[in-house]
């Protein structure tokens, strides 16, 4: 994968263009990419560490609150819970890709396939659950909801999202392997043409970005118009939240998908004709995909922590934890001779 993170970014190459010297068929000389490899060894582990720590903390809190404390869940709650689970599973793969960037893949062929597929499943499903949240918010504002809780259709939608993401990860399970240079990378048979490889790339862009972006754009624009028309309510805060959600999605996802689209076009028309351009493309995919996955760290803030109800649950949990700590400290501070009558003992001096 181009970024040592995204399993789908290099379907049209037989070797990892970031970590290896790649000989384009149109080139007369070999393109040496040592500086690209050195950049990846420094940038990817550092960025992944920050994303892993911050994202793991935020999404773990979301899962814990929704799973153990919030018993009455709405459809949005169910989507947010699934989104947090997807983000957690995505973040769990980052340490493996950080090690791969520095030392190569050391966990074997099967783990290479599973980790690559796990990344794709959760990256794609996360984008789809964002679209589901936007639809439910639009419906809640503009239509009279038929029921307040999450019913069977909501869970069916969640299952469909997961199944679609799993189907999209099949190429990772089939083509990813550990090559002779100990890197987890896709290897394609020669009979598979570049058009098929580019088609897989375009399918991922469509399902993982274009469709969610269009749904979110339409739903949140309609929601904003409905909020503006509503009398006697404070509109500024909800509108700011909607704007923040859309802006963060565009800033984090658009650059990566533009670069990914350029790679797909290059697979068909061979637009990259110089080594320097190829190196710049490698660095661009590393940086933009890292920014794209950082969205999983921001989801708890955008979709959960801004909500008043979730803040109340956090306060309740904090109070329970504080009460438990105080009780434990009080027990530890009680002296051994402070309770109950003492048995009479004989006293003497030596």
From Swiss-Prot:
Post-translational modification note: The Ser/Thr residues in the C-terminal cytoplasmic tail may be phosphorylated.
UniProt GO MF annotations: chemokine binding; chemokine receptor activity; scavenger receptor activity
InterPro entries from the UniProt entry: ACKR4 (IPR005383), CCR1-9-like (IPR050119), Chemokine_rcpt (IPR000355), GPCR_Rhodpsn (IPR000276), GPCR_Rhodpsn_7TM (IPR017452)
Regions that span the bilayer: 42-62, 78-99, 115-135, 155-175, 200-220, 241-261, 290-310
Membrane topology: Multi-pass membrane protein
Extracellular side: 1-41, 100-114, 176-199, 262-289
Residue positions with a glycan: 6, 19
Outcome of gene disruption: Mice have a larger thymus with relatively fewer cortical thymic epithelial cells and this is associated with severe reductions in cortical CCL25 distribution and accumulation of DN2 thymocyte precursor cells in the medulla. The downstream effects materialize in reduced proportions of DN3 cells and significantly reduced numbers of cortical DN3 cells. Aberrant thymocyte development culminates in increased prevalence of spontaneous autoimmune-like disease, characterized by lymphocytic infiltration of peripheral organs.
Subcellular localization(s) per the UniProt record: Early endosome; Recycling endosome; Cell membrane
Subunit structure: Forms heteromers with CXCR3. Interacts with ARRB1 and ARRB2.
Family classification: Belongs to the G-protein coupled receptor 1 family. Atypical chemokine receptor subfamily.
Name of the protein: Atypical chemokine receptor 4
Organism, as annotated: Mus musculus (Mouse)
